[in-house]
């Protein structure tokens, strides 16, 4: 692996630039590479964030199934490390993908909605 590919911050920035110019496939690749490196370094928030950004790229490309996978993985990492608000955001985007696929009545969607509701309830109870 070259030095460039080993630097998650550089890959992250390259992904942002590619995304800003509408090069979503290329951006998603940079974000995925960055996510792996962040995770290896123990930076789980940025690992989750990069998966989220890769999910956004897939969403922009209308590849909703891939976007769902990426948003779910992002949420999984976020919840595991206590970043519950971020995890909820990822799940809400996954929900948008299911809606775009016309699957808002599917069992997975109902379960996802329950999970989002429960996490939001938990977060609200922590405010006081």
Where are these regions (language model features)?
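Eukaryotic all-alpha helical interaction scaffolds
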Residues: 18-19, 35-38, 58, 78, ...
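Residue signature of alpha-solenoid helical repeat architecture, marking inter-repeat boundaries
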Residues: 3-6, 25, 45, 65, ...
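Flexible helix-coil transition and linker loops at the boundaries of alpha-helical arrays
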Residues: 38-44, 79-84
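Alpha-helical segment of the N-proximal tetratricopeptide repeat
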Residues: 4-40
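Single-residue signature of alpha-solenoid repeat helices
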Residues: 27, 47, 67, 87, ...
């Amino acid at each position: 692996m070259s030095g460039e590919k080993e630097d998650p911050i550089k890959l992250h920035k390259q992904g942002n630039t590619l995304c800003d110019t509408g090069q979503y496939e290329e951006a998603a690749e940079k974000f995925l590479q960055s996510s792996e490196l962040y995770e290896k370094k123990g930076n789980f928030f940025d690992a989750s964030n990069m998966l989220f950004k890769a999910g956004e790229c897939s969403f922009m490309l209308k590849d909703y199934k891939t976007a769902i996978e990426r948003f779910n993985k992002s949420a999984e990492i976020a919840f595991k490390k206590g970043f519950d608000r971020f995890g909820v955001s990822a799940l809400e985007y996954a929900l948008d993908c299911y809606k775009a696929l016309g699957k808002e009545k599917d069992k997975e969607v109902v379960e996802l909605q329950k999970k989002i509701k429960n996490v939001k309830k938990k977060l609200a109870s922590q405010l006081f």
